[in-house]
Every structure is written in C-alpha cells, then in structure tokens.
C-alpha cells in the first residue's frame, strides 16, 4: 500500500472520529462553531487573499470566466462569511423528529434525521465551495473531506486552515474539515474508493468531472450539477413573458448550471415570436444555433449540429429548435436533458400539467425562469449542490439532504409473537 493511500485512510479515520463527535453536538455548539468560522474568514482575509493571488498568477492564461470563479476579493470573502452566518440561522435538521407514532404492540416509534457521517467533495477551482461545504456539513453534523481543483490549491488550503483553526479554538474537532492537498487524478481516484471511510461522495463541476466520479467511484455518489436546461415556448405563450424568461434564463449568468441552453418553440407561434426572442438574445450577445426551420425564420442563426442538442455551453450560446407539438418538445427534452431544470411558457392549463407530469427533471417550471433552481431561492438557505439523480436527494440540496433517517423505538418489554 503506497503512502498516498495510507494518508487518505488516515484522513478517513480522523473524519470518522470527528463525525462521531459532531453527531453529538447541540445546535448551539454547532452555531458557535459556525460563527467562529465566519469571524475567522474576515480576520484572516489578507492571508486568504495572498494565497489566492498565487493561484491567480498561475492561472493568468486560463479563460476569463474560469479566472473570475477562482478570484477572491475582500468583498467575496465577506460574502462567504455572511453565508456561514446564514447557515447558523437555519433550522438544524438533526434536532427534529420527523414523525412519531405508537404501533399495535405499544412501541413508540420515532423517525429522526441523523447525519450521513463523512461527506467527500470533489470539485473544480471554486474556493467558495470549500467554505459552503464546510459550513453545511458542519451544521448537519457531518465531517467533510475536500478535494478541490489544482488551480485553487493555495486558496483552498488557506481557507481550510482558517476554518480548522477556528473550530479548534472553540474546542471542536478540527478534523471536521479536511483538505486533500495532492491535486493529482490518482489521488482523486483513490478518494473515490474510500469505502468504509467516506459515506457519500458529492462531485461539483462540469460534465466531465461528474461523469468521471459517477463511473469510477465505489463510494456512493450523489450526482450533481450538469445542466442542459430547456425552455419550451408553447403555442399558447405570451410573447412578452417568453422574451423576459428566455433572456433571463440564458443571459443573467450563462456559466451556471441552471442557465437555459436550449430553446424549443411551437411552430404555430414561431414565425411571430421567434424573431423577437432571437433579437432580444442577440442584443445581449448570444450566439444562436438553429435547426433548419429556425434558420428559415431567423437566417442570422448558425446551423445547429447533432452535438449541440447534448451540449451544456456555460456560455452565451443557445440552440433553437422548432417543434410541431408539445409531445415532440417533451420527447426531445427527455432525450437530451441532464434531468436538471426544464420550463414551459404557456397560458394553457392542460399543456402546463402535461409538461409538469411528463418531463423528467429534478425541477420543472411553468412560466418561470430555470434560474430559480437554487437553495436560497427555494428557501433552503445555502446548498451543497443540485442533485440530478432520483435516489436519496433530488434538486437543490440543503441541510436535510445531508442527513438520513434513523428510527428510535421505545418499548417496555415487548416481544414479537408471530
């Protein structure tokens, strides 16, 4: 067994020990730790920024949107601290009993929420994920092992150290938050195989990262993130509403997973509405790639290829298709989407209900932007990711998604008779 594997197993054992302690903490103790972490981020902002500067220097040749996600400022650190404080205000899911009842044998059965144990996070060069994950796992009573992108290594190490020291200063386990400092793929693969130490693995990043984790991990995985999201403009759509929703969903933050990537429009309204929607998008710098029917209506569009329908652009690009029916739109969406967020724009109630029932996605909208798929917008507070799978958690994952169920049964000598 090589040294790296031994180191990861040592981290796993330390995380398990920390998780046992975290599971016994009161909500007050957890909130005390969170407030200490928030204060430490602000106190040590200069140290964090110095580390981030080293990462930015090494990443200067990378795309601007990548560098922007990597960059930290005092304002962004203040936002991180505010986010941690906000987590402290959220209800503690482990302090609640979901339901309780007495069965025919006189047993009192209570269904409670308990921490998952040790959460592993594999994510790309987004230092804010380090803080978000630490805060959410701590509040829900879990330890976390973090493995961020190599481009953010100095930033992540500085952040993790600040958070660990803040916990230790309050007499709380510093191993509640651990960071893997070897950014190699080999170590990431070994992390995916830490069965017995990591209870669940959550990848956050692009399609390639998520696919690699899902295919290679032997640890249970919650699949998150990739968002090939569609907006379908129905034959009964209001033009003004369609323009506003499509532009918001595509333009506001094109690099995030809840941005719309595809526009489907019913043939009955395409001649009237598509030129207006297309102009609004193009006025915001969006490159449109259309099928033959869309390009016949808006000749300035580029030709869409078969690959376009399955591509998450994360950029100011949108593919457009004209469909003859809602059934065709639903069939296309279910064939090409990533089960993230899908929307219909319509004034027809029956069409809206058909869309809600037949589209397979974590979140399905009627007359609203896909950009609302977010823990804060759903009232969950911060989120650790957006699950696109069906088991355990689906959609924006807040604190409750980082817990599981335990049944506590109280008796007074009952034995089963048959």
Curated annotation (Swiss-Prot):
InterPro entries to which the protein is assigned, alphabetical: Ald_DH/histidinol_DH, Ald_DH_C, Ald_DH_N, Aldehyde_DH_dom, G-glutamylP_reductase_CS, Glu-5-SA_DH, GPR_dom
Key word Oxidoreductase present: yes
Annotated coiled-coil segments of the chain: none
UniProt keyword list: Amino-acid biosynthesis, Cytoplasm, NADP, Oxidoreductase, Proline biosynthesis
Family the UniProt entry places it in: Belongs to the gamma-glutamyl phosphate reductase family.
General function of this protein: Catalyzes the NADPH-dependent reduction of L-glutamate 5-phosphate into L-glutamate 5-semialdehyde and phosphate. The product spontaneously undergoes cyclization to form 1-pyrroline-5-carboxylate.
The UniProt record lists the keyword S-adenosyl-L-methionine: no
EC class name: oxidoreductase
Source species, domain of life: Bacteria
Gene behind the chain: proA
Subcellular localization: Cytoplasm
Known pathway: Amino-acid biosynthesis; L-proline biosynthesis; L-glutamate 5-semialdehyde from L-glutamate: step 2/2
EC number: 1.2.1.41
Catalytic reaction annotation: L-glutamate 5-semialdehyde + phosphate + NADP(+) = L-glutamyl 5-phosphate + NADPH + H(+)
GO BP term, pick one: L-proline biosynthetic process
Name used for this protein in its record: Gamma-glutamyl phosphate reductase
GO MF entries: glutamate-5-semialdehyde dehydrogenase activity; NADP binding
Gene3D superfamilies according to UniProt: Aldehyde Dehydrogenase, Chain A, domain 1 (3.40.605.10), Aldehyde Dehydrogenase, Chain A, domain 2 (3.40.309.10)
HAMAP family: ProA (MF_00412)
